[in-house]
Amino acid sequence: MRAARTFFRRIAAALLLAAFTGCMKWDYGPTEEFAAPDGGLFILNEGNFQYGNASLSYYHPATRQAENELFRRANGFKLGDVAQSMTIRSGVGWVVVNNSHVIFAIDLRTFRETGRITDLTSPRYIHFLSDEKAYVTQLWDNRIFIVNPKRYEITGCIECPRMTMESGSTEQMVQHGKYLFVSCWSYQNRILKIDTETDTVVDELVVGAQPASLVMDKYGKMWTVTDGGYE
């Protein structure tokens, strides 16, 4: 019975995703100029699912002041639907917008878009292996996408074993040497081990239901938090 409920939930979610894929329109408006001071904190506001009201804020501890809706104000259009995560690398912010199927690259001082990676299924997190190679985890997909951040394009994918498009879910990533570990979250219970030189899954670890957070401590030990799933 539980398997049947899970199946129908995933079918409904897949239909919703199909209905909204390609329907996101960017409504452009006026822009503002910014020059953010160093030492601030970026705050990603997820927003409500299917409302397209995700936003980006910047808080400066020295002045105790915050600026809100910075992406929209700097670029003239909204960030999108469900801002999932943000990664900073080499002075560039990479904002993963899950239900808009896009990753924006932004200047950290002006908040202006410098590029975007599109045609993603339902991106969750991005992990950089080099300036020209990164992995992107996904929901509702049995693949981890390989992207070239310099060219803002998808260059390949990693097939995850025993996952279908409907049951696919990869989440957070940590790296130890040449190996990358990926938690498999929604309705999953595994952590995958990927050889980053061959872009293949070489091993897996079964854990509790729905491992979400994943970190590596300074002693080389990996920690995960499982949320236990839901009925």
Regions found by a protein language model. Name each.
Residues 1-22:
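Sec-dependent bacterial lipoprotein signal peptides
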Residues 23-231:
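Predominantly soluble domains enriched in secretory-pathway, periplasmic, or organellar proteins
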